[in-house]
Amino acid sequence: AWIDLGKEPTVFSHPDMGSRYYLFPMYSLWMPVIESAGTRTTGEKAEKFLLTGPGWQGTVPAGMTQVKSPTRYMLILGRTYADGTEQDYEAVNALQGQFALRPLSQFGTHDWTFTPPPVNPDPGFSMTDKPQDVIVKLGTKGYFDMMGRLMCKDAPPAPEDAPIIAKMAKIGVVPCKEFDLARFDPATR
């Protein structure tokens, strides 16, 4: 599940898994594992995780484990063991039916239903062209402008990226700033 933490934290919960093997690695947008709930790491008990984005300030409700994502978006890849029989599939499906993701403001309510956010049908680039062609069509300024926007609130650079961010700043690629291609002479552009 892809999760947008831009508006508020999300609560991820799963039931007691009994003796069933399961794994829920959780990734930031940069793709390192930031938490890994599962049989080996957290045991079989039911759990609730409060997934928070960058800069979130608040109180973690009792009984929840906070998972701090350094990026606005994160990913959970759930895996639950099944032995391949119909009977076991039914047992797995019953467990999966209890996996839940809810905004923190709606956690604990019984009448909450998910309404997907509107999808932007025009992200400003082709969704069908090859990635290389999309990048070329953006042009130098467009590419570095997009990079600066993405490194702003959605996926701020990690502290360990400071050396490369400092080098990029020397040529004008800075998180949250528009790229000034005009600062370079024509030969450099």
How would you name each of these model-derived features?
Residues 1-189:
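A compositional/structural signature for long, glycine/proline-rich flexible linkers
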